[in-house]
């Protein structure tokens, strides 16, 4: 098997042992770049309130769409500055992880979903889901913002936001074991795929000088 690529073809990082790749078979990215992620968040500011907070949660926490849709008020730690997600791909139930998020996200969640009020009631609404939507409804809300932001392709999806979080974290120098914890990966080798994507991003930046 030759390592030679056709002119203009992007280098595709190797897959993890579990098969995860950040490029599809055509070499298209499955993750948003830093600029695309920022554009998505700016566009989300104009979306309906519940769609906006869902988009912000996905972008700033790196969680899976199903994990975001399972989030309840009692798992929003305003004092600690974290969101607590049930890690849905673990083999056993009851596995949670705390992910630090920006104050702006916590403020938006409180404003739109009444987090403080729900937590004060304790048991009378604090366990209700913030977004009582099906997975398809949540996906459509995110997709609508992607379209409005002019984003398309495999990266323009909730999974693309999750991958963008991983790439941004590694690019910022966050240790891989910390990124693994935040993303809820069972194996560090899965998280390590984002280091390959950083290399591809650096190549794109360098190409601007050539």
Task: Explain the meaning of each model-derived region.
Residues 14-17, 97-100, 196-210:
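DNA/chromatin major-groove-contacting recognition/catalytic segments
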